[in-house]
Amino acid sequence: MRHARDFFKPLAVGAPEPLRDIPFRPSRMIHFFPPSNDKMVAKLPDIIPTVDILLGNLEDGVPASDKEAARAGLIRVARTVDMGATQLWTRVNSLDSPWALDDLTAIVTEAGNAFDVIMIPKVEGPEDIHYVDRLLAQLEAKARLSKPILLHAILETARG
C-alpha cells in the first residue's frame, strides 16, 4: 500500500508524473468505432471534428477472430489520423481475457502518446485498478511517454 505522501510520485521509475488535477473537458458525444472495420476507419476524418471523444472498441463488440486486427487497426489510427482537439480513448478487453495484456502493452508502447484514456471494462474491485495502474506506469516508462494515460474503470458486475 502506498503512503499518502507518495500519491503524486510515479508508480514506476521513468514513468510520467501523475496529474495533480484531472483535466475536465465536457464530453457531449463519444463515438465508438470498430478499428478492424476498414469502412468505418475510412470515415473517421469526417467524424472526428463532430465528436468530443473517439473510442476504439477492442472489447465485446469485436469477435475473437478479429481481436488482433482490431488492436493493429487502433494503433494505425492512433499513429496516422489527425485527431485535432478530439480525445482518443480505447476500451480494452477485460482483465480476465487472454487479450487484455497484449492490448495494454501494444497500445502504450506503440502509440501511447496519442491516447488520452484507457477504459478498463468489468472491473471487479480496487485490485484491478491497482494492477492496471502499476502496469500502465511501467509501460509508460518503457515507452518514454510525455504524459500519463488516464484510466476509466467500468463497473459492470455485482461485485464491481
Residue ranges and their predicted role:
Residues R2-G160:
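Conserved alpha/beta-domain cores
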